C-alpha cells in the first residue's frame, strides 16, 4: 500500500493513535504494535442536559457520570482493520489442549470494518470520520434507559485529545424525547449533551485473580476458567480489587514485615466543582483508609487529592478516579468501580455525592440523637459527610 496523501494543513494530534484532522475529516493511524491489544472504552458526561422536570430518584444524567468499560480490540484481517468487542473471557491457561477450541467458542463480536487507506512506518491509516459520529459506541444510546433519552437526532465530534496511553473523543449529541421512565419524569423534552469517550490501552499482563469466598464480603465479577487436565469450563467469581503490587526493590523488606509503598498508588481526585467548605472532610474520608492498607503491608497506598487546574485532569480521562458533587435532589451518594471483567482489576472509580444527601444525614442524626444537639452546624455536617464518603470509598 502507498502512503496516503495527507493535506499539508491537516492538524496532527499525537497520542495512542496519531490523529490527522482537516475540517470534519478524521484519520487515525493504528500502530502495528497495538493490533491484538485490549483497550477499555468509557463514556463520561461532561455537561448534562437541563430539564424542566427530573425525578428525585434519577441517579444518572449529571456531569461526571461515567459508563463502561467496554473491552475492545483492533485486528488486521484481509487487508482491513477490524474492531472487535470482547464480551466474555475464559482463562484457558490451565488447559493445553482445548484453549484454541474455547477461543473459537468465545469469539469476539465484530463492531466495525475499516478499509486500509495507506500506511506509515509503524501503522495503518483508516478513516474514522463517520464512525466517530455513531452514537451506539460514542454516545449515550447504550445507556438510554438509565438517563431517560430517546433515539439520537444529531451528533458531531467537537475535539480529539491524545495521551501516550489513550485517545479521548469529545462530542455534542442531541436526543429525542422519550416517554416517562424510572430515570426521568420529563415528557416531550429534546435534550443536548456534551460527552467524552476515552479509549485507553489496558496493561499487557493481566492481574492475578483472587477467587471469591462466601466467608469474605468482597464485591465480585463472574469468572470462567479451565483447570489442568480438565475439559470442563468452571464458572466461578473473582474479587474486584485494585492492582496493589510490591515493587521489585521492596520485595525483601515487604517479606520481612516492613511497610512499603505500592508500585502504583490509588489516587482519587476531588473535582474542583465540589463546594470548598466540604473539601477537607472529603479528603480525610479517602485518606482514612491508609490505616487499613497498612494491615496489608502498604503505607501511603491511597491518597485523596484536589484535582489540579491543568489540561490532563479531566473527568473524561478514564485513567483518573473522581469524587464529584451532583446538583441533585437525590438524598444519597454512590461509588462505582470500573472493572476489567477478565481479572476483576479496578481500573478507576467514580464517587458521586448528591447535594440533598445532607437532608438525609440531618434526618438520620436527629432521629438517633434527639435533642442532644441544638443545631445542625457545618462542622457536624462535615463529619457526617466524611462518614458517607468513607463508606463509598
Where are these regions (language model features)?
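Auxiliary tRNA-acceptor-end handling modules of aminoacyl-tRNA synthetases
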Residues: 6-274, 292, 301, 307-385
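Active-site recognition of the HExxH zinc-binding catalytic motif
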Residues: 287-290, 344, 386-393
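A short alpha-helix/helix-coil micro-patch that ends at or immediately precedes a cysteine
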Residues: 281-299
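Sec-dependent N-terminal signal peptides
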Residues: 1-3
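Stable alpha-helical elements in mature extracytoplasmic
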Residues: 278-285, 381, 385, 389
Amino acid at each position: 500500500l502507498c502512503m496516503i496523501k495527507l493535506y499539508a494543513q491537516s492538524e496532527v494530534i499525537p497520542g495512542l493513535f496519531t490523529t490527522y484532522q482537516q475540517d470534519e475529516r478524521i484519520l487515525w493511524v493504528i500502530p502495528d504494535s497495538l493490533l491484538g491489544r485490549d483497550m477499555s472504552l468509557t463514556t463520561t458526561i461532561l455537561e448534562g442536559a437541563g430539564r424542566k422536570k427530573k425525578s428525585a430518584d434519577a441517579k444518572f444524567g449529571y456531569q461526571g457520570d461515567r459508563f463502561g468499560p467496554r473491552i475492545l480490540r483492533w485486528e488486521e484481517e484481509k487487508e482491513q482493520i477490524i474492531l472487535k468487542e470482547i464480551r466474555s473471557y475464559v482463562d484457558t491457561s490451565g488447559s493445553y489442549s482445548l484453549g484454541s477450541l474455547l477461543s473459537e467458542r468465545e469469539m469476539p463480536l465484530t463492531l466495525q470494518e475499516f478499509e486500509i487507506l495507506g500506511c506509515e512506518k509503524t501503522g495503518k491509516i483508516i478513516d474514522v470520520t463517520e464512525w466517530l459520529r455513531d452514537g451506539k459506541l460514542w454516545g449515550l444510546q447504550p445507556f438510554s434507559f438509565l438517563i431517560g433519552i430517546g433515539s439520537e437526532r444529531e451528533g458531531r465530534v467537537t475535539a480529539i485529545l491524545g495521551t501516550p496511553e489513550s485517545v479521548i473523543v469529545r462530542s455534542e449529541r442531541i436526543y429525542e424525547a422519550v416517554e416517562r421512565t424510572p430515570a426521568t419524569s420529563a415528557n416531550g423534552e429534546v435534550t443536548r449533551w456534551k460527552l467524552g469517550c476515552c479509549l485507553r490501552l489496558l496493561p499487557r499482563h493481566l492481574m492475578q485473580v483472587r477467587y471469591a469466598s462466601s466467608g469474605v464480603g468482597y464485591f465480585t465479577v463472574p469468572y470462567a476458567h479451565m483447570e489442568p487436565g480438565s475439559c470442563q469450563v468452571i464458572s466461578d467469581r473473582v474479587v474486584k480489587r485494585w492492582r496493589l503490587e510490591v515493587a521489585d526493590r521492596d520485595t525483601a523488606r515487604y517479606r520481612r514485615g516492613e511497610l512499603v509503598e505500592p508500585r502504583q498508588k490509588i489516587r482519587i481526585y476531588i473535582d474542583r466543582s465540589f463546594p470548598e467548605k466540604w473539601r477537607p472532610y472529603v479528603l480525610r474520608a479517602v485518606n482514612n483508609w491508609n490505616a487499613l492498607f497498612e494491615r496489608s503491608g502498604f503505607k501511603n497506598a491511597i491518597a485523596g487529592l484536589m484535582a489540579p487546574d491543568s489540561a490532563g485532569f479531566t473527568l473524561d480521562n478514564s485513567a483518573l478516579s473522581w469524587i464529584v458533587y451532583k446538583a441533585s435532589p437525590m438524598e444519597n451518594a454512590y461509588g462505582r468501580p470500573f472493572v476489567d471483567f477478565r481479572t476483576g482489576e479496578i481500573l478507576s472509580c467514580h464517587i458521586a455525592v448528591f447535594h440533598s444527601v445532607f437532608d438525609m444525614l440531618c434526618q438520620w442524626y436527629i432521629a438517633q440523637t434527639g435533642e442532644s444537639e441544638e443545631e445542625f452546624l457545618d462542622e457536624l455536617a462535615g463529619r457526617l459527610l466524611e462518614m458517607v464518603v468513607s463508606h463509598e470509598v
